[in-house]
């Protein structure tokens, strides 16, 4: 049986947590930041968790995570 390839784009974006979830970076924090409030930018700063609905897709991309 051949090895399953990891989707490298996903490997760079998601990190597995100890409880089996996946950490991710919030969107909307790369450019066009002047019109966004300081509060909004601050709330986007910490890592988020992947939704339960999307976990299966991430696991399929990261077979060895």
From Swiss-Prot:
Gene3D superfamilies: 4.10.410.60
UniProt similarity note: Belongs to the bacterial ribosomal protein bL35 family.
Listed GO MF terms: structural constituent of ribosome
Keywords: Ribonucleoprotein, Ribosomal protein
Protein name: Large ribosomal subunit protein bL35
Keyword Ribosomal protein belongs to the record: yes
GO biological process, one term: translation
Organism: Hamiltonella defensa subsp. Acyrthosiphon pisum (strain 5AT)
